[in-house]
Amino acid sequence: GGQGTSLHLSGELLNHLHKIELVHVPYRGAAPAIVALVANEIQLLFDNSMSAIGHLRGGRGKALGIAARARLPAIADVPTLDESGSPGFEASIAHAVMVVNAVPKPTVAVLNRAVNAAVNDAEYKAAVTEFGVTLIGGTPEHLMKFLASERAKFADIIRKRNVKVN
């Protein structure tokens, strides 16, 4: 990923945890980064499952580990980075539905129920799981707690690794 993206920060987290110095090479998206990996211009890539899984299944790359808490059913033979010797390594990409603060709480509750219904729909869940996506529903409070935790973890990495954004 580009400078300061979640994928870049994943690499910096690995650098920090293992006291190594991987060189970050910024790309404008996953496609050119994967082309560089396949062409052996780079030797390592952090990518999200949605863009990587087709290339992995096609034999154009090898997954060394999943940066999530648990293995992904779509590529269950790939261990987590925690299992591979990076204890506690977790750097997943999260997507959330958010609204401005002015939206009334009853409206937020209706939206939250609708999103959770979609997340828990068996057909939808099966379709996205095939691409390595793990769906997690919850409450707005749960989301805010998660975001605060991620912000704290990566703010620390940004400071310690002196990450700059262009």
Segments (PLM) and residue ranges:
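Conserved, function-defining micro-sites of small-solute handling proteins
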Residues: G1-N166
